Amino acid sequence: MVPKDNFFVHKSSYIDKGVKIGENTKIWHFSHIQSGAKIGSDTTIGQNVNIANNVIIGNNVKIQNNVSVYEGVQIEDYVFCGPSMVFTNIINPRSEFPQKGTEFYKKTLIKRSASIGANVTVLCGLTIGKYCLIGAGAVVTKDAPDFSLVVGNPGKIVGWVNKKGNKLDFNKNGESICGKFVLRNNILLRK
């Protein structure tokens, strides 16, 4: 990580002590980065974003406006989090019986280059696979395998995408029309 003069923080945002921010990262209006958070290089944090204690965010990540990344969430490199999408970190929250602290928080992993659309809800304790595409408004209740296309409430796999997010079509043998992938037992494999 680098000195503050190598990244940008808007004057309306607040960075707690003990935060590590990578080079060329930009943190925009009214955002709060809490103690122990680590944000990689070349990452953009939009307006009104909260990054909780001890969250790890990779390089080249884009987190759009109005997103809260709660403790227990880890975001790998090149992930896109759409505006107003929601992470959760407790499986059965109750106001009467507070569940605060790392022993209650479920781990959620967003793998490299996944894209999460606007207004998506990701329940805690899940893994969103590499290059996954989660459609706007989906409610993700199960792990999403690498390259899967997930939409709806509850979220369902409705197809598969390539690294650029283009939907793949398959023949009757499970081979992609582009000839680069094969689908076996709901797992997308490179040929």
For every predicted segment, state its role:
Residues 112-113, 130-131, 141:
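P-loop NTP-binding/switch modules centered on Walker-like glycine-rich loops
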Residues 157, 166-169, 181-183:
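Cys/His-rich microdomains that often coordinate metals
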Residues 3-5, 11, 16-21, 26-127:
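Flexible, glycine/small-residue-enriched loop-and-beta-strand segment within the central core
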Residues 149, 161, 167, 174-177:
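The −1 position to Zn-ligating cysteines in a subset of zinc-ribbon hairpins
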Residues 129-132, 145-147:
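Conserved catalytic segment of ABC-fold P-loop ATPases
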Residues 155-158, 172-174:
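Short metal-coordination and nucleic-acid-contact micro-motifs, chiefly zinc-binding Cys/His arrays
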Residues 173-186:
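Cysteine-rich micro-motifs
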